[in-house]
Amino acid sequence: MGRTTSEGIHGFVDDLEPKSSILDKVGDFITVNTKRHDGREDFNEQNDELNSQENHNSSENGNENENEQDSLALDDLDRAFELVEGMDMDWMMPSHAHHSPATTATIKPRLLYSPLIHTQSAVPVTISPNLVATATSTTSANKVTKNKSNSSPYLNKRRGKPGPDSATSLFELPDSVIPTPKPKPKPKQYPKVILPSNSTRRVSPVTAKTSSSAEGVVVASESPVIAPHGSSHSRSLSKRRSSGALVDDDKRESHKHAEQARRNRLAVALHELASLIPAEWKQQNVSAAPSKATTVEAACRYIRHLQQNVST
């Protein structure tokens, strides 16, 4: 496309040729992408019916691929619409004073194939006079749908999942307003050593205060925190005991008596068994120290010795 030096109608047309070619490419880009998107939607509807009869795993993979293709097509359309919005369209309007009816009549739409899209479904398109209105309306519709799908990034970050479905996300407070838990109260510091009120501790009154503060020693009768109690220790324990604790105590006492009786019987039997063994035979055949085990072993040997003597 060379530029001529002539003035008039042909010169004005030559000046408009670069801008019109750009607009043709943009229109071709938008129309082809729109047709691709519409054809893909029809194809998706047919695939949905077929995918309902297939396995669950294959249908999920197909849907993910289709969603990725749809998102790519929408991104291409958005970029094209932004390009159209950024262009100056005043030169297309017939409101210029130096334009004549012949000038507007000589500007004819030209058929172009878009070099930006490498598809076999690309068809020749023309520039419609309503291109600007269609581009702006479609751009606003796409922005609304994107806002619906993405929602607010702050609410999504606070909520943890996309979409404005949950109404509770609108009432979430920022981090600076979230109430913080109250700090736990510090435990009360008690003295390390507490002496009873009747203790005989000889300390001079001058060194009493310094020693008590340094060593942490407090007398029970002088402390406002630890007041002397009039009841005895055994009475307080008996009040705390329940019926189940009393039953456990009875079982423990009975078991203790039974064990003591068993040990007494064993001790009496061992003493009687040791008395039945003669002292002379015990000195000759038993060399270990006397114990319960040696007494039983010596008794077994003496019984075998008696059996041999009887058999002979």
From Swiss-Prot:
GO cellular component terms, semicolon-separated: cytoplasm; nucleus
CDD domains: bHLH_ScPHO4_like (cd11392)
Quaternary context: Binds DNA as a homodimer. Interacts with transcription factor PHO2 and binds cooperatively to PHO5 UAS. Interacts with the cyclin-CDK PHO80-PHO85 and the CDK inhibitor (CKI) PHO81.
Naturally occurring in which organism (per UniProt): Saccharomyces cerevisiae (strain ATCC 204508 / S288c)
Molecular function GO labels: DNA-binding transcription factor activity; protein dimerization activity; sequence-specific DNA binding
Annotated Basic and acidic residues bias: 248-259
PROSITE patterns: BHLH
Positions of region (Disordered): 35-71, 138-259
Positions bearing Phosphoserine: 100, 114, 128, 152, 204, 223, 242-243
InterPro entries in alphabetical order: bHLH_dom, HLH_DNA-bd_sf
Protein name listed in UniProt: Phosphate system positive regulatory protein PHO4
Record region (Involved in oligomerization): 203-227
GN (gene name): PHO4
